[in-house]
Design a protein with these regions (language model features):
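Active-site neighborhoods and metal-handling regions in enzymes and metal-associated proteins
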Residues: 1-373
Length: 373
């Protein structure tokens, strides 16, 4: 396990501070109130500016457009850890809304952005509003999203390390599948390996059925049988907390014609999108290309088709028909077309890319084909 100092350099943190403060000035913000909770999709905003990987609910950062950030820790012990291991911030013991509100009052600032409302508990937000009636609160999560979308070279190094763990996980998983084995047993072996190799967090989805429907570890009680289509979805946060996603479908025995055709459609769709992942391309155009590729082949799309990842498992830009974002070099994009099978269930393939001027750079090396066991 890496120490906080090994996860991020001082130069990288200074880069982030500079970019966020530049955006704050453009938005006429004096303070950004950054929240986060320990959940795979709700930690990234706070961690991005603090390097604090395990926030309790309510722990918050007051990030000023100028001056030293202030971290509100839940307990004195946690405040001491932040001060000694992370540094660069003033620490305050206590992270309740009244404590934070009192500090904001002392600054005299009135233009406070919140990042983000979806990572802040409703009662906390309501208390802030009650304690600070004269303060203008606005959600500025998009401000941080814009900064976080484009990864630095340091971040991309850790993204690549995470992708390697995904390939390692799939290699072991493929070797463990056999009739009669329980899903959960197999995935626990995979989790043990990748965590020994430095993964911070692992999030699996799986299925084992002729008509597979994706589920989570709490439902991984099925036993593998001949004729099953088997989902492997591993979203792994590597040694510095950056996620990548690898999705593959395997067949225990020869697949039927419907499954084989759906697998071909998934692969065709991935191949077509590979070349679209360039700077200047709109995410909505990629989404339409995925839908067109699937529907022109006589199938329908199932699960959502893609998104970005980073310190959160699910980040903007999203690959859908509404989050219209122009791709930039060094964005990290996951594409995972899911094709519905007419008889039930679906076929699912996907992986993580880096946007480059030459098209999507594949980070995973695992075979894309429908693996027949």
């Amino acid at each position: 396990m890496l120490s906080p100092a090994e996860r991020i350099t001082k130069k990288e943190m200074e880069r982030r501070y500079g970019l966020v403060r530049s955006k704050m000035k453009e938005a006429d913000l004096e303070i950004l109130l950054v929240s986060g909770v320990r959940f795979v999709g709700s930690i990234g905003y706070l961690r991005y500016l603090t390097n604090w990987a395990e926030p309790f609910a309510g722990e918050t950062l007051l990030f000023p457009v100028e001056g030293t950030p202030v971290f509100f820790a839940r307990t004195s012990e946690r405040a001491l850890l932040v001060e000694n291991l992370l540094g660069g911030m003033e620490t305050v013991t206590g992270s309740t809304a009244p404590i934070v509100a009192e500090y904001v009052k002392k600054t005299g600032k009135k233009k406070v952005g919140i990042c983000g409302l979806r990572t802040m508990f409703a009662d906390y937000y309501l208390q802030l509003c009650n304690e600070l009636p004269g303060v203008e609160f606005k959600d500025h999560s998009a401000l941080m999203d814009e900064v976080r979308m484009v990864k630095s070279q340091e971040e991309l190094h850790w993204v690549d390390q995470s992708a390697k763990l995904g390939d390692t996980a799939f290699k072991l998983f493929s070797s463990l599948i056999q009739e009669g084995r329980e899903e959960g047993e197999v995935f626990l072996e995979v989790e043990h390996l990748v965590k020994r190799l430095g993964a911070e967090n692992v999030y699996f989805m799986m299925a084992a059925d002729p008509k597979p429907v994706a589920k989570f570890m709490d439902l991984a009680f099925d036993h593998y049988e001949k004729g099953d289509l088997i989902f492997f979805n591993a979203e792994i946060a590597g040694p510095a907390g950056y996620y990548t996603q690898l999705v593959r479908t395997l067949s225990l025995g020869k697949p039927n014609d419907e499954a084989a055709k759906a697998a071909e459609v998934c692969l065709k769709t991935l191949s077509e999108v590979d070349g679209m992942l360039k700077p200047g391309v709109m995410t909505t155009d990629i989404y339409r290309a995925i839908v067109e590729s699937i529907e022109s082949s006589g199938f329908k799309m199932g699960l959502h088709s893609g998104h970005s990842q980073g310190l959160d498992i699910f980040e903007r830009p999203l690959i859908n028909d509404s989050d219209a974002v122009t791709l930039k070099e060094n964005m990290v994009i996951v594409i995972h077309p899911h094709v519905l099978l007419p008889s039930g269930g679906g076929m699912w393939m996907g992986e993580t890319y880096v946007v480059t001027t030459e098209g999507g750079q594949r980070l995973h090396r695992s075979n894309r084909d429908l693996n027949v066991l």
